[in-house]
């Protein structure tokens, strides 16, 4: 069994829109001790057999099956049974799907002794999702570009209380809602480390008033931040 950890954005600044349709961003990501579990077993069918306890995940097309397809197109690998025990809520801003994809790449690399270096695995993972390279790397990192620039940083040990409203917020929809007035100028690393700004927060709060009320109530108890796109 492999743990597939969630992440938090300690801040998330959107800088501009790229010609390829992605956005340039700056963020501080850190892994937290909250995780899904994936199990892997070779099979003789030369196909992927994917199952999960979540009825919200399309069992034929998701980031785990996409990760398997990417590797099977590049390397001659056998079939695998994969079971995903889902605990990280979908659409929660915690990167669960990207983490699942990264763990799948790492597991297939080990199971089939493909000897793909971490740098190459991170490069391969860019085609699966913008956050996947970070999860290949793990730890805490400065994230730049479209998510493909991952530089390790040191973050003091912190404790977080996760509040998970019963909402599913689409990353695609949130990026589509961005306009140039939401873009930010580039910060230094020290400024970024001290920031609690999330470029998506105003958009999310305007679309989901209940979330705005929740943040207002929680702010009486300490620093409140939003992770990811919600």
Each predicted region: which residue ranges?
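ATP-dependent small-molecule kinase catalytic core of the GHMP/sugar-kinase superfamily
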Residues: 1-4, 9-27, 114-223
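ATP-binding N-lobe of GHMP and related small-molecule kinases
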Residues: 1-92, 110-120, 146, 155, ...
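A short, mixed-charge helix-start or loop-turn motif at secondary-structure junctions
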Residues: 50, 97, 196-197
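Charge-dense, low-complexity intrinsically disordered segments
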Residues: 58, 95, 205
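A short, flexible low-complexity segment enriched in Lys/Arg and Gly/Pro that occurs
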Residues: 65-79, 105-106, 194-213
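Glycine/serine-rich anion-binding loops at beta->alpha junctions
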Residues: 85-112, 130, 223-230
């Amino acid at each position: 069994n492999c743990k597939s950890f969630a992440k938090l954005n300690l801040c998330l600044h959107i800088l501009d829109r790229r010609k390829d349709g992605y956005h340039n961003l700056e963020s501080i990501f850190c892994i937290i001790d909250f995780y899904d579990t994936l199990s892997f077993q070779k099979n003789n069918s030369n196909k992927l057999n994917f199952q999960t306890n979540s009825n919200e995940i399309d069992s034929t097309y998701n980031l785990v099956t996409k990760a398997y397809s990417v590797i099977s197109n590049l390397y001659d690998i056998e079939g695998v049974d994969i079971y995903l025990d889902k605990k990280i809520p979908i659409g929660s801003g915690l990167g669960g799907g990207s983490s699942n994809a990264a763990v799948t790449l790492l597991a297939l690399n080990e199971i089939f002794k493909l000897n793909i270096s971490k740098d190459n695995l991170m490069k391969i993972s860019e085609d699966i999702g913008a956050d996947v390279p970070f999860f290949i790397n793990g730890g805490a990192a400065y994230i730049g570009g479209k998510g493909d620039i991952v530089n390790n940083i040191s973050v003091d040990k912190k404790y977080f209380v996760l509040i998970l409203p019963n909402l599913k917020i689409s990353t695609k929809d949130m990026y589509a809602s961005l306009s140039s007035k939401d873009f930010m100028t580039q910060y230094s690393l020290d400024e970024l480390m001290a920031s609690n700004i999330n470029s998506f927060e105003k958009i999310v709060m305007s679309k989901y008033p209940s979330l705005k009320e929740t943040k207002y109530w929680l702010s009486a108890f300490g620093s409140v931040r939003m992770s990811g796109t919600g």
